[in-house]
Amino acid sequence: MRTEVRVHGSDLSDELRTIVHHETARLAQALRRRINTVKVELYEVPGANPTGHLARCQVDVLFDDGSSVVQVDEEDDFQHSVTEAFVKILCKRRQYESPRHN
């Protein structure tokens, strides 16, 4: 599994890099599907809210079977944005994989 991280408008701190790798490992374990690549794009959006900026995280997960999941989250800081994007992917996948009740 490959992990790619790109930051636009800010620097990638060691703490943020650690969070991305932790969340990626957690995702791989929880999904129990073979993941080919996880791409994490981080954008700082200046002036987007009263605090002066907004952190946007886009996570693209490409599985070995060719299917993919894309999730975007916006928060006040990158750490929360990254964590929330990965949590939303886990919630979507569980909902998608659970049997439907009629």
Give the residues covered by each predicted segment.
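N-terminal, polar/charged subdomain of small-to-medium soluble alpha/beta proteins
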Residues: 1-102
